[in-house]
Structures are given as C-alpha cells and as structure tokens.
From Swiss-Prot:
The gene is ino80. It comes from Aspergillus fumigatus (strain ATCC MYA-4609 / CBS 101355 / FGSC A1100 / Af293). Keywords: Activator, ATP-binding, Coiled coil, DNA damage, DNA repair, DNA-binding, Hydrolase, Nucleotide-binding, Nucleus, Transcription, Transcription regulation. Disulfide bonds: none annotated. The DBINO region is involved in binding to DNA. Its EC number is 3.6.4.-. This is Chromatin-remodeling ATPase INO80. Component of the INO80 chromatin-remodeling complex. InterPro entries: DBINO, DEXQc_INO80, Helicase_ATP-bd, Helicase_C-like, INO80/SWR1_helicase, P-loop_NTPase, SNF2-like_sf, SNF2/RAD54-like_C. A motif (DEAQ box) lies at residues 968-971. One of its GO terms (biological process) is subtelomeric heterochromatin formation. Residues 395-478, 634-706 form a coiled coil. It catalyses: ATP + H2O = ADP + phosphate + H(+). ATPase component of the INO80 complex which remodels chromatin by shifting nucleosomes and is involved in DNA repair.
Amino acid sequence: MTGAPPYNPQSPTQQPRFPVYSPPNKNRSYYPNNDQYQQHAPQTPPAFAPQPSLSRSPHYSHAPSPLPATLPPLNGGAPPPGHHPEPSSQYQTHSSAGTPQFSLPRPYSASMMSSNGASSYNHSTASHAHPSARLESLSQSPPKKETEPLYPIGGNGAPGYSSSMMREPRPASPPRETKHARAADPMSFASILSGPTEETSPIKQPSLPEALPGPATTITPAPPTLAPVPARRRLTPPPVTHALPPTSQLKVKEPEPISPAALPRLEKKPSAEKRRRNVEQEPKSAEALPVASTHGAFEPTKAARVSNRKTLTERDAEAINKIIAEIDNADKSDVESPGFEVEYGRYMVKSKKRALDAEKAEGIRRKRRRHDFLVKLGKTFEKQANAGVDRFRAANEASVIAEVQAKEIQDEKERKKDMQRKRRRENTVRLEMQKKLEAERKANKANDAAEKAKFLREAERAQRKIKSTKRALEGVTSPEEIGEVTPLAPNLEGGTTSSFHIGRSSPSRRKSGRSGTSRPKKSKEQKQAEKDAAEAAYAAMENDEPLPLAPKEDPRKETVKKEAKGARSKETTPAPVSAFESKGYNQIYEQIWRDIARKDIPKVYRIKTLSLSTRQENLRKTAQLASKQSRKWQERTNKSMKDTQARAKRTMREMMSFWKRNEREERDLRRLAEKQEIESAKKAEAEREANRQKRKLNFLISQTELYSHFIGRKIKGAGADSSGDTAVDGSDETIQPGKADHTIDLPPTVADVGAKVTNFEDLDFDAEDETALRQAALANAQNAVKEAQERARAFNAEENPMAALDEGELNFQNPTSLGDIEISQPKMLTAKLKEYQLKGLNWLVNLYEQGINGILADEMGLGKTIQSISVMAYLAEVHNIWGPFLVIAPASTLHNWQQEITKFVPDIKVLPYWGSAKDRKVLRKFWDRKHITYTKESEFHVLVTSYQLVVLDSQYFQKVKWQYMILDEAQAIKSSQSSRWKNLLGFHCRNRLLLTGTPIQNNMQELWALLHFIMPTLFDSHDEFSEWFSKDIESHAQSNTKLNEDQLRRLHMILKPFMLRRVKKHVQQELGDKVEKDVFCDLTYRQRAYYTNLRNRVSIMDLIEKAAVGDEADSTTLMNLVMQFRKVCNHPDLFERAETKSPFSVGYFAETASFVREGQNVDVRYSTRNLIEYNLPRLLCSPSGRIDMAGPGNEHAGFRGKYLQHLMNIFTPENIKRSIDEDGAFSFLRFADTSINEAYEQSHLGVFERAVRRRGQSNRLSHLNVIYDDEEDEKTSKFVLPHSLFNIVQRNDRQAVRNVTVEGYMRDLMNVSEATFERDGLGVIEPSASPAASAPPITISCSGQVALRETQDTFFNVSVRHALFSTPSRQMEQQILEKKLDPAPFSLPPMLPKPISTKGRYTHIEVPSMRRFVTDSGKLAKLDELLRELKAGGHRVLLYFQMTRMIDLMEEYLTYRNYKYCRLDGSTKLEDRRDTVADFQQRPEIFVFLLSTRAGGLGINLTAADTVIFYDSDWNPTIDSQAMDRAHRLGQTRQVTVYRLITRGTIEERIRKRALQKEEVQRVVISGGAAGGVDFNTRNRESRTKDIAMWLADDEQAELIEQKEKEALDRGEVFGAGKGGKKAAQKRKKDLTLDDMYHEGEGNFDDISAKPSGAATPVSTADNFGTPSSTPVPKRGRGRGNGKGSSKRAKTTTERLRLIDGDGGLES
C-alpha cells in the first residue's frame, strides 16, 4: 500500500499519555505559504509512524493530498531546492533556528521512488532517500530535537514515562553551545537512534544505564581541537548516527555537536593502552559486519562521509601522531588491565538482553503503529468513498428520482391498463355467457335440426370464447392441454416432480441470424385480398361449409431466391480432371455447376435442415417423455391431492359466482318489478292526492274569498253592485264601540243560522261531493267576521268609562258609507294630500272602523308615510283618539318619521324611543299605563322605535294597549318563524297597518306571512296552502305552462280587501321618468386569472350533489363560493391588496429593550445608521489633531494662520491689486463685476456661505429685459456693459411676465392655473423605476464627546436648516408676530431643489399605483369613464354596493380622483345618518353618495341625486328597487337614470337573470299579468341551493348537468341524492335562509352583527350605545351564546373550500 500517513488531529488509537507536539516556529527565513500544512505525494508507510505528538500537531493535522510530487507549492510558496544529499545522508540535522527538521520516512531507495518535492516539515533540503543497497526493509526513525520527550523502556519491556511528559510542550529554543546529551536509559527511543547498538555488531561504544539513572546529563565540551588519530581508531564507527549537514549549511550554521551521552561518565579515564588492547581483542570478522544501527542506518562497506572535509597538513598530522604516541605510551587504565574481560562479557550479555528487549518493545510499537496507520488509512478511504458516494448522489440523484417517478407513473398506467383489460374481459365473459344461454335457450326451443345445430355451434363458440377469456383473466399462457404437445395422454391423476419440460419452448427452427429481419410490408391489394379471404372463410363457417385451404407456400422461397442470386459465385468452377479440355466443354460444365448451386443445393439444404430440425424436435420430445417416465417412481408426492383440491376449489368458486350472479339477476328483476308496481301505486296516489289538494285549496280559497266578500261588501256598500260583484250583498253597519252586544247582520244571501263551524283537521277532502266543504267554508268565514267584530268591540269596551261622557265625539255608531260620503283631509295636517293619497286615507279609515287590518303597498316614493300620519291626525281630530300610536320602522328612517310627524302634525307629540338601556329606561317613565285614554295634553301620542328595540323591550310593549300599530318596511317580518314576527303578533293593539313598497320580495310565502300577520285566524299558516304556493305554481313555471287563470283570479280577489297598491306611473304624472340601463363590463387579465383559478379548484358536480342532499354546511360553503366569485367580479384587491414597496435598507435601526423606559415620545428620526462606519481615533477628531484649529494642544495653528493664510495667500488685496495692475492672473475681475475685497472675501468663504450670499442678491434689472426687449434693434438687444462682460447668466435669465412677481398676492393672481394645477396634485408623476436597495450616508464614529458635539452642531445648525428648507423656527415666527415685522425677508425660497419624483418626495417608498388600481377591475374602469361623463354633465350620483369592503376601496378611488363624497352604511351611527343625508341634500358640491344596498335603500329621501349606479346588483330585485326609489320619489323633478354594472360571462349575469324572474312574479301576482314562463322561486331549499350551484357553471357545464339530471329523472332517481343520505337526515341547527347567508356582514341597518370596517374611513372605538344596532352581542366561547369564534381544530375539506382566497366567511 502506498500513500502518505494520515495526519489527523486526533488518532483514535493514540494514547492520552503521549505529550502534545509543539508546532514549529514560523520565525525563520523560509516557511512555505505560511500555511498550516503542506501537501505530500503518496508514499509507502514507514515501519513505524511519526511520533504521536507529531500527529497531534495542529500544523500537520490534515489528510494527505492526492496531488503528484511534481506540483508546485501552494499559494506561491518557495519551491524545494534542487540539491539532493548523498544516499547515505538519510536524516537531516536540526537547524540553528530551533525548528525541528522532520522528514517523511520512505522505505524505498532513491532509485525506486523519487523525492516528493518540498519537505513536509519545512526543510531546506527535500530529499528523503535511503541507501540504495540496503538489505533490510525497515526505515529509520527520524532524529529528535532537544526538547522532544523521550520514551524509556522499563525493566519488563513496557514503555515507561519520561519526565518531559509532565510538562507542557514548549517551543524550540535557540541552539546553545551545549552538546546533545545521550539518555541515561540506553533503551530509550533517543538512545536507540543515537548510537550503534545493533546486536550483530560487537564493536560498540559501551554505556552503563544502571550507573546513571534518570535523565541524561550533558557534558560541556572542550574547545574543538583535533588530535592525530591512528588508523585503527578511524575504523571504529562514530558514536552517533546523525548525518552531517551539507557544506552549504556548515557555512551558515555550526554543525550539530556530537552528544557524549553514549559514553559513561567515569571518574577515572582508562589508559590508551588498555583501550587499544581491548580493541585488538575483538574478532577481525567484525570489520566485515555492517557498521549500522539496528534499523539499518549505515551500509556495511560505507561510512557516513562528510562532504568537503578539510585535508590535514603535515604539521597537523605530526601533531596528531604525536598525541597518539603520547596516548599509547601512557599508563594503562583500570579498564585495560587484565581481568576486565569478565566484566566486559557480562556487559555484552546485558547489552544483548537490552537489545532484545528494545527489539521486542519496538515490535510492539511497530504493530501498534501499523494498526493505527491501517485504521487511519481505512478511515481515509472510507471518507473518500463517502465523498465519492455523495458526489455520485449529487450528480445522479435527480435523474434517478425522475427515472423512479417515471417508472412509477408507467407502472400506474400499466396497472390501469390491466384493470381496464380485466374489466373488458369480464364484460366479454358476461356477454358471451348471455349469448351462450340465449343460444341454448333458442336451441331448446328450435324445431328444426339445422337451426338447433346452428344455435349449439353458437353456444359452443361462446363457450370457447368464455374459456379463452377466463384463461386470459387467470394469466395462463401455457398450452391448454399436454396432449396437444406430446403423443401421450395427460396424466391427470398424478403429478411430476420435474419441471424440465415446463415453461420451455421448442428450439427455433430458424437460425438466429435471420431472427432480426423485419417482415416485408404488404401492399394495399394484398391486405384487401386477405380481408376478402377472411370474410369468405367466416361466411363458409357460418354455412357449415368446408373451408377452401390454399396450398402451403414456403415463406422463405422468395428470400432464398434473392439470397441465391446475390450469393451467386462469380469465380469460375475448378475444371475437373478430364481428358477433354475444349473451351465449350468447360463452359457447359461450369454452367451445370452453376445451375446445381443455384437451384438444387439450396433446396437440398432446406430439406436437410428441415429433416434435422424435425428429428431433433422428436428426439427432444422423446427425451422429455423418457425423462418423465424414468422419474415416475419419484412421483409419490401430494401434488395430485393438491391438484384435486385446487380443481375442487375452482369448481366451488365458479359455482358460487354463478349462483351469486343468478341471484343478483333474479333480485334485480324482482326489484324492477317491485319498483314498477311502486311507481304505478305512486302515480295513483299522486292523482288522488292532487284531487285532495285541489279540494283543500278550493276550500281555503272559498273560505278566504267569502271573508273578502264580506269585508269588501261592508266597505263598498252599494257601490259593489255596480262592479258586478253580486255574490254577497253589502251591509252598511259598523262596529259601535259603545254597545258590547251589537252585531252585524250578515246578508241573507249567505246567512245560514244552522251552519256549524268545522275544524280544518276534521274535514273530509276525499269525498267527491264538495257541498259539505262549501258549507264549512261559509261557516268559517262567518265565524271569522264575528271574531274580528268581537275583538274590536272588546278593545273598545275595555276603555275607561270616562270616555262614555264624550260619546258624541267618538262617533262610531253612525258610520258613513264609502259610496255616499268621502272623508276629507284633517285640518291639523299641514300638508296638502294628493288625490290618490286622499283615497288611501279613506281606505285606511274604513279598515279601522271595521276593525280590520290592512297592507298599504303603494310603490316606494308615493307617500305611504304621509298617509299613515293623516290617519292618526284623522283619529285625533274627528274621534278624539290621541293614541297611543306605535310606529316601528328601520333604524335608518327613525329620524325621518320623527321629523315628518313633527312637521306635518305639530299637535301630535312624538316620543323617540331609542338609545342605550339607561336612556330607554328614562323614556319608559312617559308611558302612563294608569290612564288608558290619551288626550291632547298627554306626554306623548306616538312612540317611534325600531324593530331591534321592540324585540329587546317586548315585555314592556306588551303591557300597553296600542290604538294603532304601524309597521314601516313590513318586509322585515316576512318570516313567520322569526322571533320578531311572534313578538309583534303578541302586542295588544286594536288595528295593525303594514307599510311596504314590495309585498313580494322573494316568493309568495312572504306575502302569505304578511296576510297571516294581519288576520291570524283567517289566513292561518296551513301547510297545504303553503305547499300549494311552493309546488303548484312552480310546477307550472317549470313546465312553461300558464297558471290556472281561475286560481290566479281568485287569489287577486283574496288580496283586494286587505291590500292597496298604486304604481307611480298611474297616479303621479308630474314625476319624472326612470330609465334603467345595464352596462356590461369585461374581466381584466388579473380578474380572469382569479376567476379561472377559483373555478378550477371547485368541482361543480360535487356542489350539485351536495346541494341535492341539502346539508347546512354545504349550503354555507356554496354561498361562500358565490361571494368569492362576486369578489373577483368587483375587484381583485378584495382578495389581496397591492403592497407598499420600498428598497432594501442597508442600515441599523433603533432598538430598545422596552418602551417603558423610553418615555412618552420616542424620537427615531435620526436613529438609522449605515452599516459602514469609519472609526476615527479620538485625537484626530479633537482640536489637538487638526492643525488649523487653535487650542491648548495645537501649537501650529497660529503659524498656519499667520503664514499660510496671510503671508503666502495669493488672494490678499495687495497681491490682487498688483496682479490687476500688471495684467496678471486676476485681471479678469474687471470683466466679472467683482471688486478686490469681494474676491478676497470669497476666497475665505465656503461653498455654502457663497450660495447663501448669492441667494440674497436681487437681479431686478434682468426683469426689465422683457419690457425693453427689441428684436429689431440688434444693437440694443445685444448691448452688454464692459464691467459685466463675463456675467452671462445674470441678465439673460429671461422669464415670463407672470413669473416676475415671485411673492405676494400679485403672483397668486397671475398664476391661478398653475396654483390650481399644483394644489390638485395633477403634476404628480409616478416614478418608472426604483432602486433595489438604499442606505443612510456613511458616518464617522468617534468615541469622544467633542466629535459628537461638533457633528450635532453641524447637522442641526438652525441657520443652515433655515437656509436649506426656508422654514423659520418657532422662536423666529413668535418674534415676527410680536414685533409685527414683514415676513417676506424671512421667507426666502428654499435652496434645496424640488424632488425628482413629486409623488415620492425625497423617499423611494412606492405606494401602489392608483392607475393600476383602476385598470385591474373592469367594473371600476367602466365606472371611471362613467363618473367622468356624469361629473361633466352636472349630475349627482348614488353609488350602491353589496360589500362594505368594496366601499372602502371606492373611497380610495374617489380620493384619487378628487371627487367629494359621503358614505352611509350599516356601521354609520344613528346620529350621523341624519346629518349625512342632510349634507348630501343641501350641499351640491358633494358628487357621490356611497351607500350599502341593504342599509341605504330604506326610507331615506335622496332626491338631490338624479343618477343611481349599482356597482353590484342584489339577487332580490325589490332591494334594488327600494334603493333606486331613494332618488325616484316625490320631489324629484329630473329624469332618474339607473346604471347597473354587470360583468359579462360571469355569475353576475345569472344573478341578474334570476332577479328578472322575481320581478315577473311581482308583476303576475300584484298586477294580474300573464303568468307564462314564470319561475316563482318558491321551491324547496334543496332546489334553490342547486340553482345557486348552477350559477357557478358555465354554459357547457350547465348543459351537461341538465342532461344528467334528465337521465336521472328518467331512471326515477333524484340527481345527486344518492350520496350523503345520512347528512340529509341530520337536524339543522338553525333555519338560516340563503338570503341571510348571502347578505351576512353587508352592513344592513337591521343586522345587529354589522360592524364598522374602518379600512378606509376611521371609526371611533367607543361602543355605539346610541344606536339601535348596538345590541349586545353574546360572548364567544363555550356556553356563551352563538358567537362565532375561530376554531383551532384542523380544517376539513369543506371548510377549506370556503377559505379559497384566504379571506373566508361571507364578510365583505
């Protein structure tokens, strides 16, 4: 394995006891790149890894680089030197700078692997080569420096701890003069590396470790003097193994001194003789041994040599020889004395033992290092492998995911195809089974044998088709029977244990080389011939004729011919050996061979090949059968049993499926028969029920008709005879309040004394004879009349007996006949009643006298209010009945009622009953319940209140007996199930009068509720009557047939006595016309995108099915969807408003931990700072750091001011004068109109001071150029004075005359258009682009107070700010006022120019474009054009909306167009409504009145407007009619134009169509018009919900839904009712109508949930206690009422559909 050792920061096998390596010092002449590590080339790992301390070094803690050794150093480092030492110089010496010179060990020689470039440890020499002729493969450990720890070996061979491990690693110290000290322990790591301690070399330098325990001591050497050495001494190896450095290093650094630690420190030195003798006693063979350490540091025949060694001179040689001779002649030491050999031998034994121990310890270390290296190398490879996996994954993960997804999609497609294929096959099996059964049935019935055989063949054919299809369904692809392949019969009893012949096909008879050829294409003629042949064969099969078989053709015939032609040999056939050699003979011979090769050989080859393949096939089959037969003895398995069980199970399944199918068919037939019977029974029952309902209806109409006749004849008297109504005679009697026993004599034509009142439940409607029903109806009508009389008589009888004294005043005993005497207008009424209003008064008075309630249904604007007030005035004036009267009206008309009563009848006192609960409690003190008779002096006569307060204080109202109760806008009680209707019905009142302009709003059930309210006993809420209204009329409307004219006529007859209705065009001729126009708008691109996206999210079919179920939640969801679509049509900003944009601000903003400690006002105007700040020293910002500012710390300021600004300044007056006199540099001043002093002053002033002084100079002469400008006289016009020759701008700034006056009233008078242009904001320009980011100016930061104070003085200088912005300070303005000075000199124009963008001012904040706001909506764009035309024509507009949020957006638009407007919706306070209406009526400058359709369409008079615009229409046309009649009413003198904005191709068109149908209902029922094709919209809840769902569909979807509905109706099913049956059975929590859901949150005055939006018009946060709409809302939460709180549970799919646009709900 090759590669550099992995230098990880912490190896997992390192022991914690190893000390940390101290990194090398960088303070040296060459440290490549100053990086933490160097890359290394791959190397073979050494015998032992570097020291653990080295591995832990942060400078060498990275994985090896895979770069080759030839790469240059990184980051421009110094390249390795080219010098390589000798092969023997294995290790580098330490440098003099103390940097450890470790090199990477290499086990190979320089001849096998070259050097790896730069040293990894920053050596100046890069070679790591070893001796080339080394015999061992172990490498030498690198030498250690002085400060490196030692690793001694203990006595048992285990590694011990050195003293250096207890100290922190320290950096390398500079070299000292001491030599290396050899370790005291010869077995330590440094000791082994420093001396020749090999076992094979007996000649060693002895050392005694036992004598010197502990760390090695150093010996200070003597001065380096050389002595002559004998030749035998030179053969002794050196005491250390350190290689000497090269000569280049010896020149710069001193050589590393040899450590004497290898020598024992003896007190007495041995003599030279003894040492020489011991040396001579060594065997001579030691010279041949390698003089190297244990690890092979030196070669056997080579010693470490020093390059460039100095040659000894003769004098030196003589001195050395002399010293050697003295040593030889010296006395022998104790060591050389005899007897030391024993000690020497003992020492050698111990040395060998130590060497063995060292080798053992080194082997342990080597194994550990090898293990660590392999672990690290494995981790490195694992890391590289993981990196490779990551790279592969990053490169291919996306494609793999895409491939997997594509495969999944393809699998899903295949699965769907398989399912479709399976279904088709199952259908095929079912159909073939039917064919088979039908054929067998026909065969059984057939009499002719041929016909029976034909049917049997069809059955057999169907059976075969069923069998093959079933096999295809089961997935069986093998041959059907074994006998078709083998000649033997199939073994059905037992199985076989071999699968040799299963699933293997016979070998192909064609060669593999021909399998890839494509089939030749057939021509059209061949295809047609094949089709004809197939048809002929099918016809023959049908006729049982034998099929004509064509001769079998060889399919390869043509191919072989073509191949034979192509393969025809062009070479001549070799001539046979013959005696004839003529040319003709050879030609004939070759021709014969060619014919044979072309014709016979391919044929013979084919025959042979076919024969061979047949024989091989037979042999294969025979082998298979033989193999099967030979293994029959192994067939003793349970396969036969399993096959039997499988066949039995399959048979059972087939039987079960057959019987199930048979039972299902029988059950279907039985159900079909039962269904037909039930349908026929239903039809019969429906016919009987229709007859029964018809009799019920006839009874109810007859009863009501008789009552109407009684009342009509009573009111009309004899006048009824002239009208032709002779069914009932009239009567002139009235109810007299004074006599309790008075009765009205019924006419003799209908009076039946013996008639018996019958309950409705006891009547028999099944009888064919209707005589009993007619008698019961007559009796019930008589009883109803009597009850009405008794009720009125009882109310009068309960009056105070004191009223009998004034019986002459209460003239109820002598009523007048309507035909003889007409009631005149009351005198106390200040207004003049019109003719039709006087007739209405007569009708109301007659109703009151008869004790009958009525409905005044005049069209809006005809004066229903004044007619009601005239009735009260009549009762007070004629009959002295002063009340109490109760008027209940919507909240918006309360003030109007109070004002009208006070205005027209001042004698009648009005009590306005509204306000908070405390206010109402005070008002109730005026109710005098003790005195029933109210007089003219009573506290009040009429009480005016609202519907909400009536419900709240119903317990107080029920205690009072009211003479007359008037309900204004009576459609508020259209629901007989509401609490309002029930509370009002329970009040004690003599008569009730309902005022409504629209008696029929949505359906006829509302009209029936009003009739039931006025006559509860007669117009009872019978279910049959309501059912007739809801079903019978609808059935006629759906079938587009005419309604029963007799029933419609009788219905009108019912309504005539109780309801009076007049239309404007019939009674009011002076009232202007009303023109209605539908303005169609198109969707914009944004609206179309929203609309399409919204429709794509919703399934119309699901909505239809849910609507058929009729669930409450689904209905609410549907209405939410309708609202979302209407929002899109109105404006897309109802979903999402355009945001205000601003560039990204690169800066710091003010922050605070808490605003509590910041005080009341926090000034953050100058708290924004730039991210870039220049931090300057405090000295530089102080006066001491600037040479031009004098101060205690600046001594040079005076010098600069004296010499630089005065002596050396060229702008001094003396220098300028001298220069002008000498025509020098300043001679131009004479032409610039500048004096010497002015030039001197300008040189000492800054730019800002000069600009301020320039602004103060007036240029009045230039204005005169306009007057004295003479274009003809060129001399005069171009005349320039010499002293102002260079002043080009001063007198050439020509301006218009209107701009000459820059201030005062004259400028305003001369610039009216410009001032108007600027004031109206017409010059506002929107910027076309904005920067992406902005930042405050870069500031200078200094920590000194002086710099901060100077910065603030500069930025907030009052004089500078006044000059730049021309805004005088508050103190200056106060002084101007106090001293009464002229403000003109102090109001100079600002010096800063106007901003580039007038719209954005000095900022880049972009407000959403109003132009885009207008063009984003098709309606708003069309409205913009329309309002512009109306404004130019002097019209005033009422603008109606359905959504209050749209009103908020419209306020922004009107502000943008500068149209004055006022607003009124459900959130407007009661006291503000009156003032708002009065302002619009009295101030012509108000152009637009914004109103909510439900809030602003009731009871207010807005005749000042002549144009009504419906931004979005209501689906109830009566609401829109009421809204437009606010302007088209009495008092309107101009023509009223109504514009209705409709978005083309959307839901609004369908809503408008539905509204037109409702208008037709009103026309038919009220006016008596034709009823053809009218949809009365009285269907049940589910049908109406389905109609709403149909609005969301387009024309194609609607057509498809209608087609499916028709198909379901043909099947006798209800479309969409098959799902969700359980949901339909759920009980609804609240019967909330679709109309209520649709208008939820629209701002209806009667809606207590209406809240002010506050989006565009600020509203007060205080509780509106003064308005009737401020009803306390129940608290939200569990058990706290019906408040709608936001739920934290997960949203269902239905709820998510409601929140499509993130807006949710129906709130607009």
